[in-house]
Amino acid sequence: MLMKSRVNLLFKGPFFFRERCFQTLLNPVIAIRQLSHGSLRNSRSCRIDAKSNTLTKEIFPKINNEFKIKNRFYSSKLANDQFTLQEQCDEKGIPFILYVKDSAKKQLEKIAERKPEENSVLRVTVDGGGCHGYQVSFRMDNKIGNADTVFVRGKARVVADNISLPLISGSEIEYTNELIGSSFQLLNNPRAKTSCGCNVSFDVE
């Protein structure tokens, strides 16, 4: 009876399932994901507040099969050890995603080992310009904002803001070694209609 009263109190109003994840990142964070109940749509975004640097997981209990949680499907391109913090979704409730490939992961982990005190993340930004209308740039950063989505794989962390991410969601982040030099690159952007040969500039539908 006590359990039933507690559940009624927790889930008063629109039913929802809440998962709280605490992940050690550049800044201490708390990630809260709200999933729909019944015909309610999935929450479009997940906010992070800096309060703790300890990773735990709390899930409200499933009672009488009342809460049906749909498993999200990601492409097989997603590595098993990659996950997302401060997740953002499109208008259909589909999460935006960047695939951190092995080459990018290894290079970012090397950078993290050389300068662990800097807590650097790789920031991907899309600006207007270039020969095709939009251009992609990469830089190392040591700040994560409320509008950023963080893609974590091992010690590698890739960040994109809520303006850039919708234009490149589904792309792969690689680190390439070429005769002209080594660099991070954004490849196989499904949102791009055309792109330049150097994978820096693109246009969209």
UniProtKB/Swiss-Prot annotation:
Single GO BP term: iron-sulfur cluster assembly
Mitochondrion among keywords: yes
An annotated GO cellular component: mitochondrion
Keyword tags: Iron, Metal-binding, Mitochondrion
GO molecular function per UniProt: 2 iron, 2 sulfur cluster binding; 4 iron, 4 sulfur cluster binding; iron ion binding
Main location: mitochondrion
Keyword Metal-binding: yes
Places the protein is found: Mitochondrion matrix
Residues the record lists as binding Fe cation: C131, C196, C198
Purpose: Involved in the assembly of mitochondrial and cytoplasmic iron-sulfur proteins. Probably involved in the binding of an intermediate of Fe/S cluster assembly.
Family membership: Belongs to the HesB/IscA family.
Name by which UniProt lists this protein: Iron-sulfur assembly protein 2
